[in-house]
């Protein structure tokens, strides 16, 4: 049976009273329902209230959901403050890495982009353009190597321990994913910049007509 959960502006669906699911996934009691909603919505399980058909769901954690008159697609409204997650050691590690390393990576790409654009303007004599193009090609290729090293470093970071709460662990994983996606975006942009530079070098070398 599916029930719809509304927490602030977020809508989710939960399967309840499905005994054929794995033991860890089955939601048969009020306590299991509370825990699932708290995990999905980052809500404090101790202070949240669940409103169902105009009444608050009350009772011990072992109360069976089958006694609470749920019907298919019933709506549960979650009332309660969000958990105030702290920046634990893993999250702080990611924040520090972003501040001291990844911001510089963005600056390096922006500089390469500007230098390639300056080269394409053709203000320098041709021999100097050729020389500058070779130097830029090395810089642009080095950027990829540096970005790959950052990806390896992020992948190897121990941002979750045995004592990390699940909601904090989820937050840490999402933060790392955001950083990884940002680096991969820069890598894609840098690959396009390298192709652009190499095409201009081909023009300078006479391989492609101007």
Swiss-Prot record:
Cellular component terms (Gene Ontology): cytoplasm; cytosol; membrane; nucleus
GO terms, biological process: chaperone cofactor-dependent protein refolding; protein stabilization
Residue ranges annotated for the Ubiquitin-like domain, each copy included: 8-85
Annotated keywords: Chaperone
The keyword RNA-binding is assigned to this record: no
Superkingdom of the organism of origin: Eukaryota
Pfam families tied to this protein: BAG, ubiquitin
Start and end residues of each BAG domain: 108-194
GO molecular function terms listed in the Swiss-Prot or TrEMBL record: adenyl-nucleotide exchange factor activity; ATPase activator activity; protein-folding chaperone binding
Listed SMART domains: BAG (SM00264)
Keyword Metal-binding: no
Subunit organization: Homodimer or homotetramer.
Domain notes: The BAG domain probably mediates direct interaction with HSP70.
Described function: May inhibit the chaperone activity of HSP70/HSC70 by promoting substrate release in an ATP-dependent manner.
Protein name, as recorded: BAG family molecular chaperone regulator 1
Taxon lineage: Eukaryota, Metazoa, Ecdysozoa, Nematoda, Chromadorea
